[in-house]
A protein has these predicted regions:
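Core subunits and conserved enzymes of cellular information-processing
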Residues: 1-211
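Positively charged, small/polar-rich N-terminal and surface patches that mediate targeting and assembly
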Residues: 27, 55, 117, 158-161, ...
Length: 286
């Protein structure tokens, strides 16, 4: 099988698995606990719950899912990537279909366990989608668009959106549900932060005598540039060079392994980068 075809098949399979996990999580944990996840999924469940409780109208999850994702999907096609958006559409439609089709099943009625384990599962499923260049839809499209095309950190925007959802949920369905939903969202975010590292940056300081070779190696491995700085060892007063570069967190280990192979004597200091200004190459999404 052609390598590209094999890659796309694997991508589709992972998207399907993630959709199944999200749908099962909604039917077992989220619905049982009456929780409202963050982002578009939380808004969909909130709309469903409002219509069901106050208007006695049952709206299929799929219908709300498609309607709320219309504009984000357009943004994805127009500004992010067609394959990326098509895979995301697969996740959106399959998640909606399975959520409407699967029977509800109660694993536990303990709301704290539901909040924690539901959040763990949700974060894992979202990270699966992101690792294969897809999203679960909704605010994910907007977040990626703002961060990649406009250079805007969408965290505060998404946070504000979630606060509004939880405030409405608290007023209509009880503040205990809103507070437990915060635990769900926090757990999900922490799992996502651990598993998906592409948007996290790592700074490398490499003291070496093979600076040119290592700079080229970093570029060949990550397409990131490097800066070479002359330096002197304080103890032995020996001359060295420092290779300074910033890479994505998920590229960090592969760069360090490659540097070790090129120069076993290199001294490497790797540290998290909290803020970065200026041009930083990001792999195109498609």
């Amino acid at each position: 099988m052609d390598k590209n075809v094999s890659k796309e098949v694997k991508r589709i399979i992972i998207c399907c698995i993630a959709s199944c996990i999200i749908a099962v999580n909604i039917r077992t944990f989220v619905r049982t606990g009456g929780l409202f996840p963050g982002g578009a999924n939380g808004l969909k469940l909130l709309i469903q719950s409002i219509f069901d409780r106050y208007l006695h109208i049952t709206i299929p999850y799929t219908a709300i899912n498609v309607l709320l994702n219309a504009i984000p999907v357009y943004i994805g096609f127009r500004f992010i990537g067609k394959k990326f958006t098509l895979c995301s559409c697969l996740v959106i439609f399959l998640t909606g279909f399975l959520t409407d089709s699967l029977p509800a099943y109660t694993i536990t009625s303990d709301i704290l366990l539901i909040s924690i384990f539901g959040g763990l599962i949700n974060g894992f499923a979202i990270s699966l989608c992101l690792k294969c260049d897809a999203t679960t839809g909704g605010t994910d499209f907007i977040s990626i668009f703002l961060s990649r095309r406009k250079g805007i950190d969408a965290f505060n925007i998404i946070l504000g959106f979630n606060v509004v959802i939880l405030a409405i949920a608290g007023l209509l369905f009880g503040w205990d549900k809103a507070l437990y939903s915060m635990i769900f969202q926090y757990t999900s975010t922490q799992v996502l932060h651990v598993l998906y590292k592409q948007y996290q940056k790592q700074t490398l300081f490499i003291v070496t005598n093979k600076a040119e070779a290592i700079s080229q190696l970093i570029y060949d491995t990550t397409v990131h540039g490097a800066t070479i700085i002359d330096c002197e060892g304080a103890h032995e007063h020996s001359e060295h060079k420092i290779v300074y570069s910033v890479v994505s967190r998920d590229e960090n280990n592969s760069v360090i392994r490659a540097v070790r192979e090129a120069d076993p004597q290199a001294f490497i200091n790797s540290m998290p980068t909290n803020e970065l200004e200026g041009h930083f190459y990001q792999r195109p999404i498609d």
